[in-house]
């Protein structure tokens, strides 16, 4: 690794430890040329599957799009940022765990709904109404009834 201070290529690792619940390695390094110390972080590069849209088009997984939908559903609801981050992390983990290179967008929507159901029932109904394109109040009532079962 190049030293950020003198750009030399010779550095040594002084200390390594796991951080971020074991998902990241923090390394303390020292340059052998200028003796400056610096910290690096190492994480695994995990590729998300491509998304197969309902019209058959394929596109890269867009985390921002998913997060935006979740945040709109949870707007002005009493859910902590940590709980939201955990839900997003769980959705991404489940997508990677499929082992598939491509997943239907419907699967992502269902995973989001599953997480929202646990986070906040109102947010779940908000998301479901858009995701399932509710046409009238009856459909809202049916979804609420299913939620209460």
Curated annotation (Swiss-Prot):
Keywords in alphabetical order: ATP-binding, DNA-binding, Metal-binding, Nucleotide-binding, Repressor, Transcription, Transcription regulation, Zinc, Zinc-finger
InterPro entries documented for this protein: ATP-cone_dom, NrdR-like_N, RNR_NrdR-like
One Pfam family per UniProt: ATP-cone
GO molecular function, one term: DNA binding
Keyword Zinc listed: yes
UniProt zinc finger (unnamed) residues: 3-34
Record has Kinase as a keyword: no
Cofactor info, note text: Binds 1 zinc ion.
UniProt protein name: Transcriptional repressor NrdR
Originating organism: Vibrio vulnificus (strain YJ016)
């Amino acid at each position: 690794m190049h030293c950020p201070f003198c750009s030399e290529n010779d550095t040594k690792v002084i200390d390594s430890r796991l951080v971020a619940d074991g998902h990241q390695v923090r390394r303390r390094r020292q340059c052998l040329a200028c003796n400056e110390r610096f910290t690096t972080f190492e994480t695994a590069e995990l590729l998300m599957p491509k998304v197969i849209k309902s019209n058959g088009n394929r596109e890269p997984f867009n985390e921002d799009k998913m997060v935006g939908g979740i945040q709109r559903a949870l707007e002005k609801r009493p859910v902590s940022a940590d709980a939201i981050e955990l839900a997003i992390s769980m959705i991404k983990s489940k997508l990677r765990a499929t082992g598939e290179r491509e997943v239907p967008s419907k699967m992502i929507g269902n995973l989001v709904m599953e997480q929202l159901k646990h986070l906040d029932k109102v947010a779940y109904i908000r998301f479901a109404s858009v995701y399932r394109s509710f046409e009238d109040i009856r459909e809202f009532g049916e979804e609420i009834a299913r939620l209460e079962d």
